[in-house]
Amino acid sequence: MLDFEKPLFEIRNKIESLKESQDKNDVDLQEEIDMLEASLERETKKIYTNLKPWDRVQIARLQERPTTLDYIPYIFDSFMELHGDRNFRDDPAMIGGIGFLNGRAVTVIGQQRGKDTKDNIYRNFGMAHPEGYRKALRLMKQAEKFNRPIFTFIDTKGAYPGKAAEERGQSESIATNLIEMASLKVPVIAIVIGEGGSGGALGIGIANKVLMLENSTYSVISPEGAAALLWKDSNLAKIAAETMKITAHDIKQLGIIDDVISEPLGGAHKDIEQQALAIKSAFVEQLDSLESLSRDEIANDRFEKFRNIGSYIE
C-alpha cells in the first residue's frame, strides 16, 4: 500500500469486515456495503486525479507494475526472444526479439525488472550491463538490415554502475547506442513504462516517437539522488520530484516526449490487458504516422527531433 492510498485501505477494510459479518451472522448489510463501495470509487477517483509527482514516482516503482514481458504477449504475436551480444554474454536485464504487430514483423527490445526477489537478482533489478546495451544494438542493426520497425520499452533505474560493468565499458556501450540509434533507417518507437533513469534509459530511447505511461517517470537522476546532491539530504526527495519535472505530463509540456498514454484507475497493474491494448493502439498510430517517410527521412526525423530538444536564453 502506498502512503497516499491509506484512505482507500481503510474503506476496503470496512467493506471486507461488513462482508464477513454478513456471511457469518446471516444478516443483510448489502446497503451499507454498496454505500462504502460507492465511497471507495469516489475517493479513488479523487486521489488518482490529484496525484503529486512523488506519488507517481511511487507508482512507477511498484513491484506489481507490469514489465516488458508482461506487455509483449498482449501487443505482439509470435514473439521469439533472441539472446547474447556476440561479445561477452547474454544480459537478462535487457530482453529483445522478433514478433508481429498486426501482421508486420517488428523488433522488440526492453529492460526487464524481476517479479520477486529471486527474479530481481537474475534480472539485476532491470539495470543492464554493457552487454545488455550491445545486445540491444545488435538487434537494432539486424532490424535495420531487414527493414523491421523497432519498439523499445524503457523501465530502469539506470544502467548498472558496478565495477565489472565499468571495466567492460558501460559508458562506451551507451554512447555507441546513442550514436547508432540516431542514424537507424527504420522507424523507432519508444515507451517509458515505469522508471526511465538517466543514460540507462537513453541507451534504448533515441526514437522517432517517445511515449510515456501516465504514471511513469523520466529523469537524469532519481529524486533521492538529486536531493542528496543539491541539498545534501535524500529525505527531500519529494521536493526534488516536484522541482525536476519528471512526470509524463510535465515532460510532454517540455516537448521531450510525443504523447502520454492514460492508465487504468489505480495504475497499469490494475488491468494489464487494458493497458497493453492502449499501448498497442498508440504503437500502431505512431508507426502509421511514419509510413510516408523514406529510410533517409526516418533517420533525419529522429536526428532533428533530438537536436531540437531543449532551450536556452541569450
UniProtKB/Swiss-Prot annotation:
Pathway: Lipid metabolism; malonyl-CoA biosynthesis; malonyl-CoA from acetyl-CoA: step 1/1. It comes from the Bacteria. It is found in: Cytoplasm. It holds the Pfam family ACCA. GO terms for biological process: fatty acid biosynthetic process; malonyl-CoA biosynthetic process. It catalyses: N(6)-carboxybiotinyl-L-lysyl-[protein] + acetyl-CoA = N(6)-biotinyl-L-lysyl-[protein] + malonyl-CoA. GO terms for cellular component: acetyl-CoA carboxylase complex. One of its GO terms (molecular function) is acetyl-CoA carboxylase activity. Its EC number is 2.1.3.15. Keywords: ATP-binding, Cytoplasm, Fatty acid biosynthesis, Fatty acid metabolism, Lipid biosynthesis, Lipid metabolism, Nucleotide-binding, Transferase. Residues 32-289 form the CoA carboxyltransferase C-terminal domain. Component of the acetyl coenzyme A carboxylase (ACC) complex. First, biotin carboxylase catalyzes the carboxylation of biotin on its carrier protein (BCCP) and then the CO(2) group is transferred by the carboxyltransferase to acetyl-CoA to form malonyl-CoA. Belongs to the AccA family. Acetyl-CoA carboxylase is a heterohexamer composed of biotin carboxyl carrier protein (AccB), biotin carboxylase (AccC) and two subunits each of ACCase subunit alpha (AccA) and ACCase subunit beta (AccD). This is Acetyl-coenzyme A carboxylase carboxyl transferase subunit alpha. The gene is accA.
